[in-house]
Amino acid sequence: MKQLLEFIPLILFFAVYKLVGIREAAITLIIATLIQLLILKIKYGKVEKQQLFMGIAVVFFGTLTAYFNQLEYLKWKVTIVYAIFALVLLVSQYGFNKNLIKLMLGKEDALELPEQVWNRLNLGWALFFLLCMLINLYISQYLSDDLWVDFKTFGILGMTLIATIITGIYIYRYLPQTKSNNKE
């Protein structure tokens, strides 16, 4: 349910943008995001830092988008957020010797992987966020607003799904293999 809850504001934004327009879509996105954060707080007792950061970014850039009736502000939000995600992953690993992917996945799922695997995963996700940033920058500047909204809603979602599947396949190779002994 938690993952589904994260997509509801985006889906509502897409629908309202296609049916009504940018100002109403931005306002819908802001309200849906605030409700989402409230539900997360009530249901899970806390809001993760990443979700809070995204919520603040949505409110800030969404407000600018609604006020000026210009989609450019939300386009920049996506570019800036992905740049920050990539930067945080890289600086935490190479500047502070902390692997955030390991902290997120290793604790929650009790994954025990070799350190080099965690480092590659961290670097891989940083590169993924940089790729998303660059593709978003290109589409937002050179293609139509309608195409950008489609890309933001479905393209990045698809790219993230593919990156997650690749991560799972990569991790699976390093999981301890259990041997089943069915001899009686």
Swiss-Prot record:
PANTHER family: INNER MEMBRANE-SPANNING PROTEIN YCIB (PTHR36917:SF1), INTRACELLULAR SEPTATION PROTEIN A-RELATED (PTHR36917). It comes from Pasteurella multocida (strain Pm70). The chain crosses the membrane at residues 19-39, 52-72, 76-96, 123-143, 151-171. Keywords: Cell inner membrane, Cell membrane, Membrane, Transmembrane, Transmembrane helix. This is Inner membrane-spanning protein YciB. The gene is yciB. Plays a role in cell envelope biogenesis, maintenance of cell envelope integrity and membrane homeostasis. It is a multi-pass membrane protein. It holds the Pfam family IspA. One of its GO terms (cellular component) is plasma membrane. InterPro entries: YciB. Belongs to the YciB family. It is found in: Cell inner membrane.
